Regions:
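Second-shell loop/turn segments in exported
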Residues: 1-2, 9, 28-40, 45-49, ...
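Extracytoplasmic/secreted envelope proteins and their assembly/folding machinery
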Residues: 6-13, 40-47, 115, 119, ...
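Catalytic-core regions of hydrolytic enzymes
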Residues: 14-74
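Solvent-exposed loop/turn segments at secondary-structure junctions
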Residues: 20, 28-31, 64-69, 91-95, ...
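Structural recognition of the beta-strand scaffold that forms the well-ordered cores
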Residues: 20-22, 58-61, 86-88, 132, ...
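A short, glycine/acidic-enriched catalytic loop
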Residues: 68-104
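Active-site-adjacent substrate-binding region
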Residues: 107-134
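Active-site-adjacent mobile loop/cap segments within catalytic or ligand-binding domains
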Residues: 129-182
Length: 182
């Protein structure tokens, strides 16, 4: 179900490098553009990719959490220090104002179901990996597919190695959910 590309021209790190260079050229990084606009900028590109590849069923928006500097979100899996992960779901609803009408998301329930399925599989196979599901008021581009999540992989206090180590069990969990394995 999941394919890993060793070719450095097409793998995720290569894509990350390309995105960083493009963002730097457009002055999106280094604090020059309001981060609140990041989802608007990303949405345009994601919609283009989805239009060109309509068979894409899953969107994973990968982030790291922001935590106090003395907090380290790490566990050990297969003898390796591994960053803990958390799904972040946007509800297009706030307690103070109710529905966020200008940010509709027809897939709120689908997105939540997907997150809960991931959480369930994590609890079965990697009980210390998953930090839970965080619910927030906006939509974070999760309206683009029924299986869309924002994944917090560790935090700024985790090493790159710890975050990379989290991707192996996450890929296993994702595969189990997408293929119906238990």
């Amino acid at each position: 179900c999941l394919e890993y590309h060793r070719d450095s021209e097409i793998n995720v790190p290569a894509a990350n490098d390309a995105i960083f260079l493009l963002a730097k050229q457009q002055e999106i990084v280094d604090g020059k553009i309001d981060r609140n606009q990041a989802y608007d900028f990303a949405r345009e590109k994601v919609e283009q990719v989805l239009e060109e590849n309509p068979s894409i069923e899953v969107i994973i928006d990968l982030h790291r959490d922001g935590v106090p500097e003395d907090r380290h979100l790490v566990t050990e899996i297969n003898g390796k220090p591994t960053a803990q992960i958390m799904c972040f779901n946007g509800l297009s609803y706030t307690t103070n104002n109710g529905p966020v009408e200008y940010l509709p998301n027809p897939y709120i329930q689908d997105n939540l179901a997907f997150s809960f399925q991931l959480e369930y599989q994590a609890a079965q196979y990697y009980p210390d990996l998953y930090r839970g599901i965080y619910l927030a008021g906006l939509r974070y581009n999760l309206h683009l597919r029924p299986k869309a999540i924002l994944l917090e992989a560790g935090a700024q206090t985790n090493s790159v190695e710890e975050v990379k180590n989290a991707m192996e069990p996450f890929a296993d969990i994702l595969n189990r959910v997408l293929t119906g394995q238990s």
